[in-house]
């Protein structure tokens, strides 16, 4: 099989996955309807995110950017579609946000062509994840999420220690985001006050 045929096969297999109809499971408890297939997996991420599709730079068509998982999405019904801001976790266990949409919220979720470009706060984050969305009457969609940063009190050379804080951003189109200052809460300090 030549390179072009392999690329076509990747896209064809991807389209089968994306367009697969999701059916309810036979057993149900009368309260929750569970479906046979997850609505999003790492395999749903666009082929062109994962592969360099240029035969000159990737002659063996090896996956270049591994995706580990899609999880913990914020959801909203927006412009008549079910839209998720998905935590996409790379093989390096670092996460980024990407938008996927579906006409019915059950199947046919498709990622937008580009992941979310989230502006940094004053102190850059090493990882961001688990956004929740709220459409506000002021016309903005607000996203609250977790931002991890290197722990400044960690011993020298310890790159695994991190602090986690709430972070907030807003958008009107889910493409262009404005980062707002991280919320500050002093209530978590009460247990330590003397």
Give short role names for the model-derived ranges.
Residues 77-79, 135-138:
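Residue-level detector of Asp-centered blade-edge/turn motifs that repeat once per structural unit
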Residues 81-83, 139-143:
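Entry beta-strands of beta-propeller and related beta-repeat scaffolds
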Residues 107-119, 174-186:
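Blade-edge beta-strand/turn elements of extracellular beta-propeller
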Residues 89-93, 148-152:
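Short glycine/acidic-enriched loop and turn motifs that connect beta-strands
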Residues 187-194:
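Conserved small/polar residues in nucleotide/adenosyl-binding loops
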């Amino acid at each position: 099989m030549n390179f072009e045929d392999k690329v076509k096969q990747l896209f064809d297999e991807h389209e089968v996955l994306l367009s697969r109809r999701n059916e309810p499971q036979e057993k149900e408890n009368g309260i929750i309807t569970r479906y046979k297939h997850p609505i999003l997996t790492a395999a749903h991420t666009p082929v062109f995110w994962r592969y360099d599709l240029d035969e000159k730079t990737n002659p063996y068509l090896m996956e270049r950017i591994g995706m580990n998982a899609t999880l913990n999405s914020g959801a909203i019904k927006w412009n008549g579609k079910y839209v998720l801001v998905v935590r996409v976790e790379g093989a390096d266990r670092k996460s980024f946000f990407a938008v996927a949409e579906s006409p019915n919220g059950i199947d046919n979720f498709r990622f937008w062509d580009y992941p979310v470009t989230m502006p940094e706060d004053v102190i850059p984050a090493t990882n961001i994840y688990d956004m929740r969305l709220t459409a506000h009457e002021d016309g903005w969609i607000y996203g609250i999420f977790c931002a991890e940063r290197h722990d400044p009190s960690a011993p020298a050379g310890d790159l695994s220690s991190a602090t986690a804080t709430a972070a907030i951003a807003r958008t009107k189109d889910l493409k262009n985001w404005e980062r707002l200052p991280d919320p500050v809460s002093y209530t978590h300090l009460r247990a330590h006050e003397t």
